[in-house]
Amino acid sequence: MNIIVVGLSHKTAAVEIREKVAFAPTQMEKPLQAVVALPDITEAVIVSTCNRVEIYATTRDVAGGMARIKRFLADYHNVPLELLEKHLYSYHGEDATRHVFRVASSLDSMVVGEPQILGQIKTSYGYAAEYKSSGIILNRFLHKAFSVAKRVRTETKIASSAVSVAFAAVELAKKIFGELSDKTVLLIGAGEMCELAAKHFINVGVRGVMVTNRTYERAEKLAEEFDAKPVHFEALMETLPKADIILSSTGAPHFIIHEKDMEDVLRRRKHKPMFFIDIAVPRDIDPKVNDVENCYLYTVDDLNGVVATNLEQRKVEAAKAEAIVEQEIGQFFKWLSSLEVTPTIVALRTHFDEIRKAELSKTVSGWKDLPPGAEKKLDALTNAIMNKLLHQPTSVLKRTDQGNRNDLYVDALRNLFDLEVGGETQDNMMDLED
């Protein structure tokens, strides 16, 4: 049985394409059942996020299974296959396993190390389990992916460094103030950077967030999203004394906060420190503000330096994570191979043993005056011969480094000797520890 992956991501398709094939999380039953109803597809999990849509499936027919899933994606979403296909990737065997382990470990994410993707895959697996589209192989496969992701998080520092300007700003604020839960943040601007910063500040425990923007409606919208307080831009100078941390990212062509403003602001704050983060280009805050006592100003260049350093560190940690993924691939394939190899070996030995015993019985029954103990010796002899004959094929089957050749060997033996192989059981899953 083969694991296959068919999908697209931010690396292969623009958002205009990704949104065409996205699956609604609350409506997963229908597409999951449709995939497992495809010929030769036995199990399926659908992962659909803002950055990727992927289908994980099991099949004996790799090429056919991939083609059917591609056609399903096109037909289900009413998108021409010729348009979709140039954005799709497909993997099977070890490549499929490596891909999913890397995705779960956030090695394939837009921001390497981000934690959201693991939770999204767990949610997707939950739907597959609920609607019974996953079975023994994908159940084990996804649990192994979760285990790999946990190892990566535990054994590397891949998620510990800021790799976006907005996140770097929050990390810098933490270094300056320590605990941020009792601090008030003022966001000047309502664009993507301010939105990201709002998310990060709230994630680290900030409860007081204010938002101002030249267009008040945009400030209101962002404030509503994060349970913050919208402020009219005209009230900026009256609002500044209430803020401990000010992050500014507007499109203004000139400074909106000047050195001369700070004397009155600090007096009203009783000279408590203020932390300014100016990530606008051109800059929003007069650089001379940094010369004012108790005012600390950082620009986008300061933060980019932090990000660049952390990106280099994250590359080192990513290499460690890739090594963990490679280790775990071997363990998973050892278990996967055993699902079909072990029953086949048992069936092969049973088949040969039945022939041996039948021929031994015929020989013994027609042998008059058989010496005492001879039957026992003949039984041992024929059993030894059988073991010698089966040793080499059994050893080859038990090897775990053969990739898809094991499937060929298993199918060949089953067909050549007309073997009756028992079904795969849940007990096999216990052969591989987390």
Curated annotation (Swiss-Prot):
Marked site (Important for activity) residue numbers: H99
Record's keyword terms, sorted: NADP, Oxidoreductase, Porphyrin biosynthesis
Catalytic activity, reaction form: (S)-4-amino-5-oxopentanoate + tRNA(Glu) + NADP(+) = L-glutamyl-tRNA(Glu) + NADPH + H(+)
Residues that hold NADP(+) according to the record: G189, A190, G191, E192, M193, C194
Positions annotated to bind substrate: T49, C50, N51, R52, S109, E114, P115, Q116, Q120
Transcription listed as a keyword: no
Protein name as annotated: Glutamyl-tRNA reductase
Naturally occurring in which organism (per UniProt): Geobacter sp. (strain M21)
Gene: hemA
